[in-house]
Structure formats: structure tokens, C-alpha cells
From Swiss-Prot:
Skewed-composition ranges (Gly residues): 34-47, 105-115
Active site: 221, 224, 329
Cystine pairs: none
Gene this protein is translated from: Otud5
Region named Variable-loop: 273-283
Function: Deubiquitinating enzyme that functions as a negative regulator of the innate immune system. Has peptidase activity towards 'Lys-48'- and 'Lys-63'-linked polyubiquitin chains. Can also cleave 'Lys-11'-linked ubiquitin chains (in vitro). Acts via TRAF3 deubiquitination and subsequent suppression of type I interferon (IFN) production. Controls neuroectodermal differentiation through cleaving 'Lys-48'-linked ubiquitin chains to counteract degradation of select chromatin regulators such as ARID1A, HDAC2 and HCF1.
Lineage of source species: Eukaryota, Metazoa, Chordata, Craniata, Vertebrata
Its EC number(s): 3.4.19.12
Organism: Mus musculus
Protein name: OTU domain-containing protein 5
């Protein structure tokens, strides 16, 4: 078999469709063609390929993803983007699908502008016909958008007869997202910041007003897709590493199915995707939809999802919602009125939002108990203040009552003495009463409770038990005064001679008997337990001294005989 030399690359303005097909056979067999790719990728067909319609030799650019759903054609047909194989042709490997291909619905955008529907190519050679099945579809790079395919950068020349050139092989064998970063950066630079901001604001407002959804911003570090899914499943975007690890493990366990959608080596693809800064695409979305058994809805500047990925089993679980911004970044779309955290983790008897409701009930119960305890404490404080106020009022009433009783006793004593009482004795009694009143006021101010309990007229039981009347101030002073050394056996305190019957103390003996009786009583009955002994003695001695001097003067007057005038 003769191998012709490579054909020189045509100039950029040349039309490949007008070039005549070169003579010679095609290579006997291409390298393994990857299946219809959803994660973005090249055709993956090794040798030169011929388009039956155009007659152009060379690799075809990637095509958009096929629509999901029933396709026209007889039963058993591969897909509408696969052409019929001529009789006698040898068909290439056919992907075995275990679940629906991870692609959008018929209504979703299938590819970017200028993308054409892919088709299998048939090359006719001298030794036979070889068909390579699987012109793969690119849906974006590591952060490629949903439904947007990215064309692979190709060499200036087109593959010639006899197989692809080394330059072509080097460019065509790249991984699915080789043009992600340069193309995304170029698109972002070409956008007007004001327009982008206005569009983002409209998108967020439309979702909130029409659907009630809220867009949660994810960190732009290359793991935005996994962060958005982690926020939906675990409620914490920082668990994106766990989501990525589970997703990659799931892809490896189902490599026989997902490898048909990747043009590069599947192990190399998985190892690259395990890096935390590598973005995700539709392959990972389909894997996570199956892994968590929840649909994945993608929103892009619309209130309706532009793409939905379904799991193997249909259920009523809330879908995982993500939003796609500027063709390079994913955010999480949450429904604040319906809890979805924990759904899809396989937890038995798990009810979304039940934990929050339980915590809320416990918080309300604790708050109510704390409020009740606080109110009880306030009630106790108010009751204590009320009791203290009542006690103060009672003490004040008792004090005023006792002072009034003292005034009444003094008034009665004045009425009993009558106008014949000497002024000096009246002054002495008044001074004694004033001293007693001042002493009593001082005593009541120091110990009102004990005074009221012992000497107040509110306690008649004590006086009735002892068989005595409440002592008057004069009587108290008289009892405390020691007997006068000059008093013979009978003496008068306030008047002399004929006024003995009107005196409170007629003789010393009743006073001594009363004094002995009082000494047998407890001092607390008179409220004397809080008095200072020195002050009492000083007051009593002063009054006694004054009365003693007065009595001495009176006795001297009575004893001196009148001078004999004869």
C-alpha cells in the first residue's frame, strides 16, 4: 500500500469544499472513537474522515448535544445525527447507555452559534469501508455552559490522506475543556460591565418575584458548581470537596457508561476533575442527579430552567437548582419556603425542615419558661415591696397612736389635778412628760416594731394578763426614781398636805409594790431592750435630782417653825 505525502495546508481564504478529494485509500482503522459527548470534546476519530455529502477529507468540528426524547427514524436506528452505514461496512464501537443521556430537553438550547449537528463519517478505501461512530459533542469546558458546545481549536491545515498529522493529533487529542479559560476570559472582557450588572439584577429580581427563589452567591474559585450542589444538599457550600469526591467516585464506578461521553482518556479526565479548582460540566451534573436521585435544574437569565438532568428513578423530591451566569459561573438557587437540605443523602425517615421546626419549638418553650420565671420574680419583688410598705404603715400608725395615747393621759392628769395644783408642780410634770415623750419618740424611731409589739395599745392582751394599765409618763418616771431620803413614810410628789388624794402616787409603798412588779416583768414588754442603759440612767438621774432638790426645799419650808413674835 502506497502512502502519499501530506497535503500542504490551504490558505485561510480557500474553501475546502471546492478542493478535489486526494487519491489513495483511507487508513484501515481509526483510533477508538468516543461516544456522543456531553462534557465537551472533539470528535476523537483517529484517521482522516470523509463527509459523504461534501466530500471533504479531515476531522469534523464538534457538534451540539442531541436533544433528549424520541427521535425520528426506524426502530434500532442509532440517532438522527448518525448516517446509514453502507452495505459491507464495518461499524465502530457503539456506546452502551445505562440511563438517558445527560443532555437537555428538546426545548433547551442545543449549541452555540455556528455549531452544526454532528454526524458519523464513512470513509471508503481500497481494502474496505471503515466507519467511525461517535463524533462527540462539546457542552463546554470545566465551566462550560449548559447546552453550549465549544469548538476545538484546529490547526491551520486539514488532515491529509494517510492519517492525521502529528500537529493535528496533538491538537485533537486535548481534553474536553481545553478552551475553557481563554474563551471565558475573552467573553468576559468583551461584555459591558453595566449591561452585565443590569442583566444580573433583572435575573435575580425575576426569579424572586415570579418563583420566590433566592440566588445565593457562591465563591468563584473553580468549584462553583460543586459549591452550589453542596449548598443544596448539605446546606454548606464549604462541603464542595465531599460532593466532588463522591461525584468522581460515582463516575469511576460507572465508567463504562460515562466514558462514552469523554474524548480524552477517562482516567486522566477523572484525575483532572478531582482537583478542587477544576470546574464541572454536564457530565458531573448528570452524575450528581443520579447520585442524589434529584433532578438538576439549570437557570440562565430566565424564570424557567433551560436544562434539566434527571436521575434514574423518578420521585417527588425537590430538584437541585443552580443558576448559570456569564457563561462561566454557577450559583445556588434556593426556595426559602421549602427545606431541601438533606434530601438525597439516603437518610431513613428524614423529613426536611423537621430539625428546624424542633429547634424552633424548643427555643419558644425555653423563651416562655424564662419569661414566666422572670414574671414570677417580678411578682415576688412587688410582693416584698408591698409587705415592707405595709409594715412601715403599721409602724407609723402604732407610733402615732401611742403618742396620741400619751397626750390623752397627760390631758386627763391635768384635769384631775385641777386649778389648785401649784404651777411649779405642773411645770415639773410637763417637763417630765415632754422628756418622756421625747424619749419615747427617740425609742420608737430606733425600734418601732418592738415598741409597737410591747407598749402599743394594740396589744391589750399583755396588759390584761398583768392586770395593769398602760403606765403614764409620770408614773414611769416615778417608778424609775429612787425614793427620797427625806421622805418619812408618806410623801406627796406634786403637792403638800391636803392634795395627797389627787396625786398619782399617794405613798411610797404602792410605788414600791408596782416597782417590784415591773422589775419581775421582761424589759421587752416596755421596749427597753433596744435602749442604751447609759442614756436611760442619765435621764432618770437628772429628773430624780431635780425632784429631790424640789422636795428638799418643800420639806425645809414645812419643818421650820414660825418665829416667835413675843
Amino acid at each position: 500500500m502506497t502512502i502519499l505525502p501530506k497535503k500542504k495546508p490551504p490558505p485561510p481564504d480557500a474553501d475546502p469544499a471546492n478542493e478535489p478529494p486526494p487519491p489513495g485509500p483511507l487508513p484501515p482503522a481509526p483510533r477508538r472513537g468516543a461516544g456522543v459527548g456531553v462534557g465537551g470534546g472533539g470528535t476523537g476519530v483517529g484517521g482522516g474522515e470523509r463527509d459523504r455529502d461534501s466530500g471533504v477529507v479531515g476531522a469534523r468540528p464538534r457538534a451540539s448535544p442531541p436533544p433528549q426524547g424520541p427521535l425520528p427514524g426506524p426502530p434500532g436506528a442509532l440517532h438522527r445525527w448518525a448516517l446509514a452505514v453502507p452495505p459491507g461496512a464495518v461499524a465502530g464501537p457503539r456506546p452502551q447507555q445505562a440511563s438517558p443521556p445527560p443532555c437537555g430537553g428538546p426545548g433547551g438550547p442545543g449549541g452555540g452559534p455556528g455549531d452544526a449537528l454532528g454526524a458519523t463519517t464513512a470513509g471508503v478505501g481500497a481494502a474496505g469501508v471503515v466507519v467511525g461512530v461517535g463524533g462527540t459533542v462539546g457542552v463546554g469546558g470545566c465551566c462550560s455552559g449548559p447546552g453550549h458546545s465549544k469548538r476545538r481549536r484546529q490547526a491551520p491545515g486539514v488532515g491529509a490522506v494517510g492519517g492525521a498529522s502529528p500537529e493535528r493529533e496533538e491538537v485533537g487529542a486535548g481534553y474536553n475543556s481545553e478552551d475553557e479559560y481563554e474563551a471565558a476570559a475573552a467573553r468576559i472582557e468583551a461584555m459591558d460591565p453595566a449591561t452585565v450588572e443590569q442583566q444580573e439584577h433583572w435575573f435575580e429580581k425575576a426569579l424572586r418575584d415570579k418563583k420566590g427563589f433566592i440566588i445565593k452567591q457562591m465563591k468563584e474559585d473553580g468549584a462553583c458548581l460543586f459549591r452550589a450542589v453542596a449548598d443544596q444538599v448539605y446546606g454548606d457550600q464549604d462541603m464542595h470537596e465531599v460532593v466532588r469526591k463522591h461525584c468522581m467516585d460515582y463516575l469511576m464506578k460507572n465508567a463504562d457508561y460515562f466514558s462514552n461521553y469523554v474524548t480524552e482518556d477517562f482516567t486522566t479526565y477523572i484525575n483532572r476533575k478531582r482537583k478542587n479548582n477544576c470546574h464541572g460540566n454536564h457530565i458531573e451534573m448528570q452524575a450528581m442527579a443520579e447520585m442524589y436521585n434529584r433532578p438538576v435544574e439549570v437557570y440562565q437569565y430566565s424564570t424557567e430552567p433551560i436544562n434539566t438532568f434527571h436521575g434514574i428513578h423518578q420521585n417527588e423530591d425537590e430538584p437541585i437548582r443552580v443558576s448559570y451566569h456569564r457563561n462561566i459561573h454557577y450559583n445556588s438557587v434556593v426556595n426559602p419556603n421549602k427545606a431541601t437540605i438533606g434530601v438525597g443523602l439516603g437518610l431513613p425517615s428524614f423529613k426536611p425542615g423537621f430539625a428546624e421546626q424542633s429547634l424552633m419549638k424548643n427555643a419558644i418553650k425555653t423563651s416562655e419558661e424564662s419569661w414566666i420565671e422572670q414574671q414570677m420574680l417580678e411578682d415576688k419583688k412587688r410582693a416584698t415591696d408591698w409587705e415592707a410598705t405595709n409594715e412601715a404603715i403599721e409602724e407609723q400608725v402604732a407610733r402615732e397612736s401611742y403618742l396620741q395615747w400619751l397626750r390623752d393621759q397627760e390631758k386627763q392628769a391635768r384635769q384631775v389635778r385641777g386649778p389648785s395644783q401649784p404651777r411649779k408642780a405642773s411645770a415639773t410634770c410637763s417637763s417630765a412628760t415632754a422628756a418622756a415623750s421625747s424619749g419615747l419618740e427617740e425609742w420608737t424611731s430606733r425600734s418601732p416594731r418592738q415598741r409597737s409589739s410591747a407598749s402599743s395599745p394594740e396589744h391589750p392582751e399583755l396588759h390584761a394578763e398583768l392586770g395593769i394599765k398602760p403606765p403614764s409618763p409620770g408614773t414611769v418616771l416615778a417608778l424609775a426614781k429612787p425614793p427620797s431620803p427625806c421622805a418619812p413614810g408618806t410623801s406627796s410628789q406634786f403637792s403638800a398636805g391636803g392634795d395627797r388624794a389627787t396625786s398619782p402616787l399617794v405613798s411610797l409603798y404602792p410605788a414600791l409594790e408596782c416597782r417590784a412588779l415591773i422589775q419581775q416583768m421582761s424589759p421587752s414588754a416596755f421596749g427597753l431592750n433596744d435602749w442604751d442603759d447609759d442614756e436611760i440612767l442619765a435621764s432618770v438621774l437628772a429628773v430624780s435630782q431635780q425632784e429631790y432638790l424640789d422636795s428638799m426645799k418643800k420639806n425645809k419650808v414645812h419643818r421650820e417653825p414660825p418665829p416667835d413674835k413675843s
